[in-house]
Curated annotation (Swiss-Prot):
It comes from Halothermothrix orenii (strain H 168 / OCM 544 / DSM 9562). Keywords: Ribonucleoprotein, Ribosomal protein, RNA-binding, rRNA-binding. Belongs to the universal ribosomal protein uL3 family. Part of the 50S ribosomal subunit. Forms a cluster with proteins L14 and L19. GO terms for biological process: translation. Pfam families: Ribosomal_L3. This is Large ribosomal subunit protein uL3. One of the primary rRNA binding proteins, it binds directly near the 3'-end of the 23S rRNA, where it nucleates assembly of the 50S subunit. Gene3D superfamilies: 3.30.160.810, Translation factors. GO terms for cellular component: cytosolic large ribosomal subunit.
């Protein structure tokens, strides 16, 4: 069974290993999370574990959600996510902490990437620019966006538009350190999104053989 937790990106720093090598790490406040609902195939049509993270004042929660949290006997949570693959011994009201992960373990981290705003094709899709002088009138334009015969622009054509703010998953990141007292995970490398962005950390699906 896979394991997972919801966390918040706090920022990046660096630590040193036993040989004095610098390791860039992202500090993530992972949990503590609480199980809100355990969904089973017989009743809900599929098996999943609904998990909540970060307390929120009761007056900020509408009545249906308030009743949902009360049934589980937990405080209202700001962020709620479902994990499809989960340990069967977890039940409603149980707490999930960083202790589910170990140092050296590989994880997949999912988050919302930083929004860049409206961007052209050079920045957004890495297009090459045209000549900048010698009479050229083609500098940073996208060029042709389709053929004459189709008389339309095909779906998926790379064009200028809003860049970033996409759901991104980075696979096979190493857990360098686990701090159980402060609920912190130190993950090697960078993870998607800005500081204070919400992340989902799961056990790696495609474990790299050379990692």
């Amino acid at each position: 069974m896979a394991k997972g937790i919801i966390g918040k990106k706090l920022g990046m720093t660096q630590i040193f290993d036993d040989d004095g090598n610098v390791i860039p790490v992202t500090v993530v406040q992972a949990g503590p999370c609480v199980v809100i609902q355990k969904k089973v195939e017989e009743r809900d049509g599929y098996n999943a574990l609904q998990v909540g993270f970060e307390d929120v004042p009761e007056h900020r929660v509408n009545k249906p959600l308030k009743g949902h949290f009360e049934r589980a006997g937990v405080k209202p949570k700001k962020h709620v996510k479902e994990f499809m693959d989960f340990p069967e011994d977890l039940n409603e009201g149980d707490e999930i902490t960083v202790d589910i992960f170990e140092e050296g373990e590989l994880v997949d981290v999912t988050g919302i990437s930083k929004g860049k705003g409206f961007a052209g094709t050079i920045k957004r899709w890495n297009f090459s620019r045209g000549p900048m002088s010698h009479g050229s009138r083609f500098h940073r334009a996208p060029g042709s966006i389709g053929a004459v015969d189709a008389s339309r622009v095909f779906k998926g054509q790379k064009l200028p538009g809003r860049m970033g703010h996409d759901r991104v998953t980075i696979q096979n990141l190493e857990v360098v350190r686990v701090d159980s007292e402060k609920n912190l995970l130190l993950i090697k490398g960078s993870v998607p999104g800005p500081n204070k962005g919400i992340l989902t950390i799961r056990e790696a699906v495609k474990k790299a053989s050379n990692a």
